[in-house]
Design a protein with these regions (language model features):
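Bacterial Sec-dependent N-terminal signal peptides
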Residues: 1-23
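N-terminal beta-rich core of secreted/periplasmic extracellular enzymes
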Residues: 20-176
Length: 176
C-alpha cells in the first residue's frame, strides 16, 4: 500500500513539475530568446514585408464589410505591421482582432487611443474620469490604480498599445 501511495505521489509531482514548464518567448525576462525569435522572423522577410511592418491602419470595428475587407487585403498583400482600432463595440473588436491576427504572417501590433478607458472608443464598456478630472485628484495612488485598470481592460481585448495618456492643450471651451 505504501509503495502505491509513493508511486502516486511521484506521478503527481512529476505531472506538476511538467505542467509548470513554459514557452520562453512568453516570459518577460527571457530577452535573449525573444531577440533570437524576432531576428529569425525579420531575417526571413522581404524588403516589401519589412516596409509594410512600418504601417498601422485605422479601422472602426463597426465599419462596413468593404472597409474590413480592404484592411484584410492590406494585411495579406502589403504586410502592414498593425491596426489602430477606433469606434465600435467590444465583441466586434475582439472578433476583428482575432480575424486580422489569423491572416497575418507576422503578429500584428494592436493599438487604440483609450485615454479614459475603452468607453472612449467602444460602446457598452466602463468609462473612467477624463484626464482633467484625474489631474485634480491629489492622491497619486488613485491615479495609479485607474491607469492599471485601463491597462488591464485594453489588454483583455487584445490591445498591445494604448496611445495614452496624452498631453492636450485646453484652448477649446467646447472640448475641455
Amino acid at each position: 500500500m505504501k509503495k502505491s501511495i509513493a508511486a502516486l505521489l511521484l506521478l503527481f509531482s512529476s505531472v506538476a513539475v511538467l505542467a509548470q514548464q513554459f514557452n520562453p518567448l512568453l516570459v518577460q525576462n527571457d530577452r535573449e530568446n525573444q531577440r533570437v525569435w524576432v531576428g529569425s522572423i525579420y531575417s526571413n522577410m522581404s524588403l516589401q514585408e519589412k516596409v509594410g511592418q512600418l504601417f498601422m491602419v485605422d479601422i472602426y470595428s463597426s465599419d462596413p464589410k468593404e472597409k474590413k475587407d480592404k484592411v484584410k487585403d492590406l494585411i495579406q498583400n502589403q504586410y502592414i505591421g498593425g491596426i489602430i482600432f477606433s469606434k465600435g463595440g467590444p465583441k466586434q473588436q475582439v472578433q476583428l482582432n482575432n480575424e486580422f491576427q489569423a491572416l497575418s504572417r507576422t503578429p500584428l501590433i494592436m493599438a487604440m487611443d483609450a485615454e479614459w478607458g475603452l468607453a472612449m472608443r467602444l460602446d457598452s464598456t466602463f468609462a473612467y474620469p477624463w484626464n482633467m478630472t484625474l489631474g485634480a485628484i491629489s492622491d497619486n495612488k488613485i491615479i495609479q490604480k485607474i491607469g492599471k485598470r485601463i491597462g488591464e481592460h485594453t489588454k483583455r481585448i487584445g490591445m498591445h498599445i494604448n496611445f495614452a495618456p496624452v498631453v492636450d492643450i485646453n484652448i477649446n471651451p467646447a472640448n475641455p
